[in-house]
């Protein structure tokens, strides 16, 4: 929420009357005290074997920036950059990317990087297939691929620790991708080409139980930023943007360790 609305909320609900300047000073103190923890979170992510990535546009000082998230089962790091190309991650994480399995959407920047392994988000693909099924309901090509993906996800969920060979699943997918769907329209052809391009990264979650089939963790982690931008549309300062992303990193990481957001923020004022 903007500082003015926070001050209004504290006044109306709790009878407190901090000035907006006090709120800024508290945010500045929390951000400063959070730096050692932010660096430690980054180190843990760089040493992690499976990392989910996502990015979202955010306006700051009337300028389009990009908020990025890198997250694992135990850690979340959000940060701001002026672009959404692969160089952002290279500059941030260096050669540690080569030791990671990345879980991402199909944004081209992720495929320009040399990850150890890669998994595309099945939830994204299923949404795109559902859209095509609704767009043209007199065909079953998109439904067949969606059912194949759901079957693979069910197989993993039913056998959470098993190493499941992906060869037979790829063969079934290839048979569907060989079908002529020119008559279905451009959007079908576009998705078909996209699936062919990322074919090798669709079923990797079957062969490694540590790899999730979706990137929902990254989407959840960046969702509060989108809510903030719906409320106030933009960040008025670089400090405000960075403070929100860094404090959100602290809170999300704390929650993954069964700590409350209140305790996480409170700890920043006890340093």
Residue ranges and their predicted role:
Residues 1-271:
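Catalytic center-proximal scaffold of phosphoryl-transfer enzymes
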């Amino acid at each position: 929420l903007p500082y003015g609305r926070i001050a209004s909320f504290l006044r109306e609900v709790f009878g407190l009357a901090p000035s907006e300047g006090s709120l800024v000073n508290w945010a500045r103190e929390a951000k400063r005290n959070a730096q050692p923890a932010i660096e430690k979170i980054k180190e843990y992510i760089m040493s992690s074997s499976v990392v989910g990535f996502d990015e979202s546009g955010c306006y700051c000082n009337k300028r389009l920036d990009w908020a990025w998230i890198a997250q694992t089962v135990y850690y979340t790091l959000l940060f701001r950059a002026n672009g959404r190309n692969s160089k952002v991650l290279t500059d941030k994480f260096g050669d540690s990317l080569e030791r990671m399995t990345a879980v991402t959407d199909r944004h081209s920047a992720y495929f320009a990087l040399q990850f150890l392994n890669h998994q595309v988000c099945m939830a994204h693909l299923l949404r795109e297939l559902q859209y095509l099924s609704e767009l043209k309901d007199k065909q079953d090509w998109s439904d067949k691929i969606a059912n194949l993906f759901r079957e693979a996800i069910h197989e993993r969920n039913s056998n959470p620790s098993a190493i499941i060979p992906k060869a037979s699943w790829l063969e079934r997918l290839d048979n569907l991708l060989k079908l002529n769907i020119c008559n279905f329209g451009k959007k079908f052809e576009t998705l078909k080409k996209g699936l062919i391009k990322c074919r090798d990264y669709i079923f990797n979650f079957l062969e490694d139980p540590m790899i999730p089939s979706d990137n929902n963790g990254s989407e959840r982690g960046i969702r509060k930023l989108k809510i903030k931008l719906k409320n106030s549309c933009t960040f008025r300062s670089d400090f405000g943007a960075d403070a929100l992303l860094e404090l959100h990193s602290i809170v999300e990481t704390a929650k993954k360790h069964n700590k409350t957001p209140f305790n996480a923020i409170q700890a920043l004022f006890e340093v």
